[in-house]
From Swiss-Prot:
<comment type="function">
    <text>Catalyzes the formation of S-adenosylmethionine from methionine and ATP.</text>
</comment>
<dbReference type="InterPro" id="IPR027790">
    <property type="entry name" value="AdoMet_synthase_2_family"/>
</dbReference>
<feature type="binding site">
    <location>
        <begin position="141"/>
        <end position="146"/>
    </location>
    <ligand>
        <name>ATP</name>
    </ligand>
</feature>
<dbReference type="Pfam" id="PF01941">
    <property type="entry name" value="AdoMet_Synthase"/>
</dbReference>
<protein>
    <recommendedName>
        <fullName>S-adenosylmethionine synthase</fullName>
        <ecNumber>2.5.1.6</ecNumber>
    </recommendedName>
</protein>
<dbReference type="GO" id="GO:0006730">
    <property type="term" value="P:one-carbon metabolic process"/>
</dbReference>
<dbReference type="GO" id="GO:0005524">
    <property type="term" value="F:ATP binding"/>
</dbReference>
<keyword id="KW-0067">ATP-binding</keyword>
<dbReference type="InterPro" id="IPR042544">
    <property type="entry name" value="AdoMet_synthase_3"/>
</dbReference>
<dbReference type="GO" id="GO:0004478">
    <property type="term" value="F:methionine adenosyltransferase activity"/>
</dbReference>
<comment type="pathway">
    <text>Amino-acid biosynthesis; S-adenosyl-L-methionine biosynthesis; S-adenosyl-L-methionine from L-methionine: step 1/1.</text>
</comment>
<keyword id="KW-0808">Transferase</keyword>
<dbReference type="InterPro" id="IPR002795">
    <property type="entry name" value="S-AdoMet_synthetase_arc"/>
</dbReference>
<dbReference type="GO" id="GO:0000287">
    <property type="term" value="F:magnesium ion binding"/>
</dbReference>
<keyword id="KW-0460">Magnesium</keyword>
<dbReference type="GO" id="GO:0006556">
    <property type="term" value="P:S-adenosylmethionine biosynthetic process"/>
</dbReference>
<keyword id="KW-0547">Nucleotide-binding</keyword>
Amino acid sequence: MANIVVKRLERTPIDEIPVEIVERKGIGHPDSICDGIAESVSVALCKMYKEKMGVVLHHNTDQVELVGGYAYPELGGGCMVSPIYILLSGRATMEVLDKETGKIIKLPVNTTAVNAARDYLKKALRNMDLEKDVVVDCRIGQGSVDLVEVFDRKRTEIPHANDTSFGVGHAPLSTTEKIVLETEKLLNSDALKAEIPAVGEDIKVMGLREGKKITLTIAMAAVDKYVNSCADYVKVKELAKAKVEENAKKYLDGHELEVCINTADDDEDCIFLTVTGTSAEMGDDGSVGRGNRANGLITPFRPMSMEATSGKNPINHIGKIYNILSNIIAEDVAKIEGVRECQIRILSQIGKPVTEPKILDIEMIPENGFELEELSPKAKEVAQKWLDNISEVTERIVSGNVTTF
């Protein structure tokens, strides 16, 4: 059995502390654009490697940079005058020696990466003209010999950790966390875009809970071709606010809610108007890992890892595997009857099997009437089950069924 430690979480439950702050950067935020591209490139490379070689080869595509363009948004429709520049970098296996034939097999890494990036942009940013508004530059290089060796060792057996690092997770989400997450999902949903097409994808939701009152401060880009006047713009905000308030009722659990959208607006002279739906068109730059953590949120009142999850290889990169695994374990432990709140930390040692962390730390707050001693064996069983089936985590990632930002 792995080194699994269970102890009491010595803190007030998150929903009972007097103040809580939670943030989510939406899919059109420049940092989230980079996260989304990095992960899409990694998933595409995984599929290409499996198709051509039967296995996922070494790669890390977590170095995506976005340099903002320049635009002239106008009521009724403006234009881009300088495109957004996106740099794909990182490392990937581009050549493989076929031991049977002695020949070098060249793999279409850069082509796969560029196509994946463009496909993601097409899906994420509905109003962007990919032929004119964005330049995608691929500079992915061959992987480090040492890291490839660690990655390839005993490929048919358990992968070995590429680094000494850690992952963290928590569950269940607090009321504030749920509302922040679901608000961004709502505003960027297909259904809402069909009803209010002027709502762009660059959305940031900042949630503040003070006692039983939650305030959402939302930055929401508007798409200029759907907004013909300042009155139209104000109407878009009013419609979006009403949708947010209605949706939040499902999660409020007795809390009061205040929704504020684009608080910097002067509704005559200064409004959040864009051509493409993202502030990346106006010099707002982005990078992988500067935004949401693996659970899709930024939670300063919870433990967090500073490691970027998107774009890292899903086989043995601890910054990816353990952050995602921590959240999965936390979610399952939180389902155990009697567990009110759970935090997970998993630490690796470089070169050791990913199924054998140096420590897997579980902290729990029991519900009233339950003791830690009776919950501990159940929590350990959940954690061990996931360590024994860690390949399932990899499969979820490769299939694109895991959120990394």
